[in-house]
Amino acid sequence: MPELAQSVTSTLASYYEEVRDSIHGWVAPISTEQLWTNPYPYGNSIGHLLLHVTGNLNHYIGARIVGTRYVRNRPLEFTDTSRRPKEQVLNDFDRAIDMVATTIRKQSAQDLVAPYSDETQPDCPDRFSAFTRMAAHAYHHTGQIIYLVKELTKAD
């Protein structure tokens, strides 16, 4: 079983890093101004999506598993008007991904099935469920980011 746990943790941690690398590749050609531009009257900007994914990981993994004491302000993830520089937003995102990947790689088989508790995630009974749920969430928003980058950079 230890080999399976090591394979699972290695693969899952690498997946988070692939999401990070993909996002970096997609947002590389856009400016800070474009990061905060929403090309539609609905939805979110790339910047707000990155704040949201960062907050999600810092809360559900950082605060709930690592014990970072991160306090999430979810509404602000979608309404922040500070328009921080792209590099700062990406650095915060990278730190969250690094924290998650490091945490996952430290998990034993027993750790993966350790109880996980968050009132907003009742269908995540253990850490493995939380790690996979947050990976799916990050990938979902990666798709939205890819779409928005394509919209913001397409030729008229």
Tell where the protein language model's regions lie, with residue ranges.
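Hydrophobic alpha-helical core bundles mediating ligand binding, dimerization, or RNAP-core interactions
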Residues: L12, Y16, R20, V27, ...
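Generic structural signal for secondary-structure transition and capping sites
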Residues: D21, T32-L35, N58, D98, ...
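Acidic/histidine-rich alpha-helical segments that form the ligand environment
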Residues: T81-P115, S129-H137
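Short, contiguous alpha-helical
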Residues: P2, T9, A13-E17, H24, ...
